[in-house]
């Protein structure tokens, strides 16, 4: 793939990831303004940090991506591109959770 084609594709992927983040995020914030509400709430119930909960969600997608890379087959109805977009979004969410935690520690 040529560099310009890669960045064109990358921009398209990032726009879709942002759209997915907004759409899916509404369901999980439970009408709260805290973007990480879902991870914190589950963490409290399971005695885990929000980062750990987010990592578990990420690893679920990574297992699916790993399976695709090793076998070349998609076993779910969601295409591999969707799994990659979800994994990238969970990495972004994890980064946000860590950023928020570090900011609170320095205040």
Region locations from a protein language model:
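Intrinsically disordered, low-complexity regulatory regions
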Residues: 1-107
